[in-house]
């Protein structure tokens, strides 16, 4: 699976290369220890080396590769690093939801339910990219609603990594256990209902449950390639 072209509208060539390489690394197509050649990547994408260097800098800042004189060495994401990503996401969602759980969230809940509706349509049509995107949009909407500048800055620093992990995990889930995606939809709907009711304890429980289940799903799919190396 390639990075969805519909997600790349308006992106520079360097950003396109970054997104494709990030997905290859997360999916295990570029395994840890692999040396990425600027010349080969430039040839593969039909471009000069300048956009490739741009992509390498971004991937290095995300900790997915290590820049060396001989080239860029793939690091990937270890199970511990994936755990840390989920830890940060869970902490952020816990915090932001508590900021507005007792307010009138009618508009937000309506928006969340519209995203869930789109997830249901995507599941019906086996549309991996759309399902992943709407799942991501659901969680991002929770963060944006808080209007917390520093948390938003943190989120933006890892949003592409999160989106790519979700895409890779959804691809594996659709292929091996698509029924789990219906469970995901149900849990998102339950979360939206709890937010509508202002049930902060239920929301906290659902967030913890969601990230526990997500960890297990990613360990069974995305990280399996790393355990084999």
Model regions and ranges:
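Hydrophobic, amphipathic alpha-helical faces that serve as interaction scaffolds
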Residues: 88-101, 137-176
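Amphipathic alpha-helical dimerization/coiled-coil segments
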Residues: 95-121
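Hydrophobic packing residues in well-ordered alpha-helices of helical domains and bundles
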Residues: 85, 112, 131, 135, ...
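Residue-level recognition of alpha-helical structural elements
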Residues: 81, 105-108, 124-131, 147, ...
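Short linear motifs at protein or domain termini
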Residues: 1-102, 150, 215, 219-229
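C-terminal all-alpha effector/ligand-binding and dimerization domain
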Residues: 115-116, 125, 167-229
